[in-house]
């Protein structure tokens, strides 16, 4: 279907000049205009993309955001600082413990509260597990969307072991809600058991699973053809657009907030 504007469209100024700007971008011969999302399993109802396709290659994408507004700010007005942690978990259910830590860290900074060294260590370990949890799904879901189902299953299998750790410390697998202002929900049930679970995952399971996922994807000709050289971001572009984390480092930006400006 061709891409058309409506009077309710908020991202374009509906003047003649703006419509002229779109000429040549719609109904182009040999190009396919695809309306992707928001009601699509891969978008999770968070955004809509109007894609211009040349075969499998996306030539242009016009994003439309704003579908995820859930009134979080208004909800926060009726909760205290510790109750709100439950909502932060839902903001990013892929790695909820990271949002728990970020929320209470912000409150503690405003209130000038210092954490004990033990609390900082526990939060740091859980934060890193949360990042691994996030990246496993990121790579796995990308593989799934590009036709490499097995890589997705490998990633999800390893995430289950992080869920086991979260369940052990908090009693909740999916949304641990473990942090509190100035500390944690409670101390580790058993430090020795916690250490064994973490070491088993990081030193035994994860190195093998990462190697397996890497082999599955890097030797998958279809997957490689669909990603190699596509959508590359230069170091200069990454810096100009303020990319952070793995995206920035993959583009050659030697920047890691945990080392450059530690917050725990």
Q: Model-found features: residue ranges?
A:
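Active-site bordering "gate/hinge" segments
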Residues: 1-48, 52-264
């Amino acid at each position: 279907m061709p891409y058309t504007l409506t009077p309710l469209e908020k991202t374009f100024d509906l003047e003649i000049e703006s419509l002229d700007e779109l000429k040549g971008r719609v109904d182009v011969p040999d190009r396919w205009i695809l309306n992707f999302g928001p009601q699509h399993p891969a978008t999770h109802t968070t955004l809509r993309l109007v894609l211009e396709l040349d075969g499998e290659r996306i030539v242009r994408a016009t994003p439309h955001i704003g579908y995820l507004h859930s009134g979080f700010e208004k909800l926060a007005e009726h909760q205290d600082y510790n109750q709100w942690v439950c909502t932060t978990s839902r903001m990013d259910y892929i790695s909820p413990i990271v949002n728990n830590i970020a929320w209470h860290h912000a409150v503690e900074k405003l209130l000038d509260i210092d954490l004990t060294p033990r609390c900082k260590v526990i939060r740091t370990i859980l934060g890193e597990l949360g990042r691994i949890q996030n990246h496993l799904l990121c790579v796995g879901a990308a593989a799934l969307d590009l036709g490499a189902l097995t890589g997705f299953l490998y990633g999800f299998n390893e995430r289950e072991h992080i869920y086991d750790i979260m369940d052990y410390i908090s009693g909740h697998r999916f949304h641990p809600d473990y942090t509190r202002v100035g500390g944690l929900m409670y101390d580790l049930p058993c430090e020795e058991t916690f250490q064994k679970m973490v070491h088993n995952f990081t030193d035994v399971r994860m190195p093998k699973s990462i190697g397996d996922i890497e082999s599955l994807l890097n030797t998958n000709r279809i997957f490689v053809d669909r990603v190699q050289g596509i959508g590359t971001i230069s170091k200069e572009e990454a810096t100009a657009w303020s990319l952070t984390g793995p995206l920035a480092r993959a583009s050659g930006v030697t920047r890691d907030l945990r080392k450059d400006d530690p917050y725990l």
